[in-house]
Amino acid sequence: MSSDAAAQERLPGLLLVLSAPSGAGKTTLAHRLREASPDAVFSISATTRAPRGAEREGVDYHFVTAERFTELVAQGAFAEWAEVHGQRYGTLRATVDEALAAGKLALFDIDVQGGAQIKAAWPQQAATVLVLPPDEAELERRLRGRDTDSDETIRRRLVAARAEVARGLGSYDYVVVNDVLEGALAQLQAIVRHERLRHAGRWDPEAARVAEACRRSAAPLGGWAS
C-alpha cells in the first residue's frame, strides 16, 4: 500500500449531504463519487414501503412496518425522517454513528430539509452541498429531455426546484454547479478531501482552494443568483 493510500485510510469519517432539484444530476454525481472513493458508502434509510424489484434488506433500505417506524420515531432513533407519497423514510442515528466510527465517507442523497437535520445532528462531521444545473432554463431542458413527464409535472418540478434552491442557498455549506459532470465531480472530490483533512488537522492547498471557491458565499451561481 502506498503512503498516500495509507494516509487516506487514516482520515476521519465524513457525512457528505448532496441535495438538488430534480434534474440537476445529483444522483449520477453521488454514484460517480462512490465509485471513485474506496471508503464511501451510501447512507441506508429505513422505510415503510415494500421492496421493489431486486432491492435487498440492509443494502438498499432497512424495510420496516409502519408500526415499527412509529416506534423508532418515538424512541428518537431517527436523525431525520419524512413522509413521501404516503410512505415514510428516515435516517437512523445508529447507522450514521457506525459509519463515522469506521472512518467512512457516508453519502446522503436527500432534500434540503433532511440535509439541514443531518447537519444539526452532526455539525462537525457533516458537510452539505447543493448541486445545481447552470440555470433554470437548463433544468427545464433536462427535465423535458427525459421524455417521461407531462408539461404539468414539469411545471410543478420547476416550482419545487425554486423553493429547494432558495432553501439550500440560505443554509448549505457548498454549492456545486453541475454544468460539466467531470468538473462537478472534481469539485466534490476536493470538498471531501478538504473537509476530511481539516478534521484531521491537515492541509492540502489545492483541495482547499477548490473547496473554498465552492463555498456558498463565494460560489458562482449563474442563473440562480437572483
Curated annotation (Swiss-Prot):
GO cellular component: cytosol
EC number(s) given by UniProt: 2.7.4.8
Keyword annotations: ATP-binding, Cytoplasm, Kinase, Nucleotide-binding, Transferase
Principal localisation: cytoplasm
Residue ranges of domain Guanylate kinase-like in the record: 13-193
Compartments (UniProt record): Cytoplasm
Reactions catalysed: GMP + ATP = GDP + ADP
Disulfide bonds: none
Gene3D superfamilies referenced in this protein's UniProt entry, alphabetically: Guanylate Kinase phosphate binding domain, P-loop containing nucleotide triphosphate hydrolases
Xref: SUPFAM superfamilies: P-loop containing nucleoside triphosphate hydrolases
GO molecular function terms noted in the UniProt entry: ATP binding; guanylate kinase activity
SMART domains registered for this protein in UniProt: GuKc
Family affiliation: Belongs to the guanylate kinase family.
Role of this protein: Essential for recycling GMP and indirectly, cGMP.
Entries under NCBIfam families matching the protein: guanyl_kin (TIGR03263)
HAMAP family cross-referenced by the UniProt entry: Guanylate_kinase
Protein name per the record: Guanylate kinase
Gene source species: Anaeromyxobacter dehalogenans (strain 2CP-C)
Gene that produces this protein: gmk
